[in-house]
Amino acid sequence: MQLIYLKMTALSKDEKSAANLLSTIKTALANQSKNPEMVYQDSLQSTIYMGNKMARIPKTEDLDAVNYDRVLELGKQMFTNAKDFTFFFVGNYDEATLLPLIEQYIASIPSKGAKLKNKAIPVATGEVKNIFTKSMENPMSQVTEIWYAKTPYTLQTSVLADISARLLQMDYLRNIREKLSAAYHAGAEASMELDWDGQLALSLTGSAQLNPEKLDEALPYFFSGLKTTIEQPNASDLQKIKEILTKQASVDAKTNGYWTGILRNYVINGIDLHTDYVKTVSSVDGKAIGDFLKNIVLKPGNHLEVIMKATKEEAGK
């Protein structure tokens, strides 16, 4: 806690460390155009956030424009005022010992002025495609399919999104990786984040690293897998997922990290993701999954597709 106090009340200037950090980042970014993974991630971020500089991978010339004094000024604006901070204490501690330390090092941090407001970073909507070709030494194509929606944040939404992504992942692994032998990796995930407007930004993402020769053959399975999961989710997969989540919940509940996350969601987002979690998981059936995907995820019509087609790099280039 003493370190927290010092970091928030006594930000000091260290030009040598700052210069070393910038040099390290510049070195990592210097050859990003030759790194297929960085090229793809930059294209993906630029597509999702429509080229917004706040979201894309920086370039070396961006670092040349960094003003260290301005960085410190921004740091002081954000970290020397505790009004916008919530501190969580989780674990096996003695309250009588902890409270005086909180009073000394946390309660004494200045708390004044207005809270910072979230900055809106627009996200691409509608049907968006970014398909490009990249030559590389070891050709590997990459595909990302994102379905995006805004919806109220609830425990039910969180559970349905998680289970839906797991069902898609099992379908993609079974068909794209095992059946077609087309993928080095194929999977799906759900992302849930409270956006600047207070609504849940929900995205369901399917992705794969593919053998370039099987890209065209594998691509339709991202959509057929989604269609199947809507119309008739695999009952065996669904039961297995529910059992895994129920078992994992009891394991997670014994960890500090779990309770920190639960408290954070409750205080910041106003959502209790613990009390009825197991009951909510147990109640999920195929119809609930289909209705969720059709009426929540797909209804807005937001679909982003980013494909990097890979070709063999010519020798000497």
Language model features with spans:
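Glycine-centered hinge/linker elements that transmit conformational signals in sensory
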Residues: 101-115
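M16 family metallopeptidases and their MPP-like homologs
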Residues: 1-9, 21-30, 35-64, 82-90, ...
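Short, surface-exposed beta-strand/loop micro-motifs that present aromatic residues
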Residues: 73-77, 127-135, 293-295
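His/Glu-based metal-binding/catalytic segments typifying zinc-dependent metallopeptidases
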Residues: 114-171, 175
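Non-catalytic, conformational "gating/processing" segments within enzyme and secreted inhibitor domains
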Residues: 41, 68-105, 301
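A short, acidic, amphipathic alpha-helical segment used as a generic capping/interface helix at domain edges
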Residues: 70, 285-292
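Extracytoplasmic/secreted cell-surface and envelope-processing proteins
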Residues: 95-99, 195-197, 214, 314-316
